[in-house]
Amino acid sequence: MREDTFFFQWWFLVSGLSFIFLLPQAFTYHTPPINPCFAHPFLPPITNPRLLKAFTALQAWKFTITSDPNGFTSNWCGPNVCNYTGVFCAPALDNPYVLTVAGIDLNHANIAGYLPLELGLLTDLALFHINSNRFQGQLPKTLKCLHLLHELDVSNNKLSGEFPSVIFSLPSLKFLDIRFNEFQGDVPSQLFDLNLDALFINDNKFQFRLPRNIGNSPVSVLVLANNDLQGSCVPPSFYKMGKTLHEIIITNSQLTGCLNREIGLLNQLTVFDVSYNNLVGSLPETIGDMKSLEQLNIAHNKFSGYIPESICRLPRLENFTYSYNFFSGEPPACLRLQEFDDRRNCLPSRPMQRSLAECKSFSSYPIDCASFGCSPPSPPPPPPPPPPPPPPPPPPPPPPPPPPPPPYVYPSPPPPPPSPPPYVYPPPPPPYVYPPPPSPPYVYPPPPPSPQPYMYPSPPCNDLPTPVHY
């Protein structure tokens, strides 16, 4: 055998053995870990079909989780999904004898991962709270199968994409919170036609204008802050929300225009915050009709004029912040509030105000609220009446008059003549004494006895006639 041939065979044999020796290690390194929930072949079967679907959904979700530093999902194993951390079971609405997964609450768990399509299997879910985590991606479209979902809170995550249109397929939804995410683009106007109680879409990257139908929303809390409203003004329909709206926050959202006097119709408001915008004009005096108002923040705008006194006399107002504007007058009632901030205005005799040149420069440009395309606002409130002029100095006192003559003393009248003694009337006559009544009535004597009847004498028997016999 040739030497080169022998060397080739020997090299091939050694190389093959090395490859065979290293092959298991290579494949073992790339093999995914075995899910411990399926490592036991003798798990009891799940006879409840609804809990079986929930088991499938939760195991698929756990598989997408990339980080769980606090171990919230460490016990998501086995068929008893009702014992999983953050999973809550309750009797089904259509069958109280069947147990279902009715709620998921993983708030503040700091979990990283994605939301899988299998979440659509949780058809009995009424509450889904996963705020303050690190979930990425988009809301799965399969959430449209959750017809019983009442509350959806995915706030403070890293969700992205356009506004999740799956929201419009949830007929039972009342509470929607998608704030502090990375959603972007337009906000559909039909969002404000939904029958919601609370709506939070603040602190995203939305770019939209306030729609004309915003007044159709029956929400009690509306937060749109820290988005780009693209210079939109407040639509007239906004003031139709007076019966339900309690809190509205639209800070730092490029809001422009003037506030209409109809804002006083929002008489249920407790919080009104439109700070850090480009609102102009004067404050409507009708804000004084919002008797429930507790927090009023209009700072960092371009309001001007005189602050109506009725605002500062609201019975429940605790904090009124109107700093960084161009107000030129404030009533003393504002200075008696529990908390107020009037810095950086044009208020005379108040500390920390704008310079006189800055105030004159701003007032040299007239404000035309109609130019913003909003409904014409009410005329600005009249300035307070000037203080009355000081009274004129009193005239010098006149010279003292001469002393009056002594009063004339009339002589006393002569004494009246003595009056005659009073007439003494004679005593009245004695009362008439009537004579006594007559004696008893006269008693007549009895009549004399009547005379005896006269008896004629009978004739003698001899004088009788003799009867004649025939």
Swiss-Prot record:
One of its GO terms (cellular component) is extracellular region. GO terms for molecular function: structural constituent of cell wall. The keyword Hydrolase does not apply. Hydroxylated on proline residues in the S-P-P-P-P repeat. Keywords: Cell wall, Cell wall biogenesis/degradation, Glycoprotein, Hydroxylation, Leucine-rich repeat, Repeat, Secreted, Signal. Glycans are attached at residues 83, 319. Residues 1-28 form the signal peptide. LRR repeats lie at residues 98-122, 123-146, 147-170, 171-194, 196-217, 219-241, 243-265, 266-290, 291-314, 316-337. It comes from the Eukaryota. Pfam families: LRR_1 (PF00560), LRR_8 (PF13855), LRRNT_2 (PF08263). Modulates cell morphogenesis by regulating cell wall formation and assembly, and/or growth polarization. This is Leucine-rich repeat extensin-like protein 6.
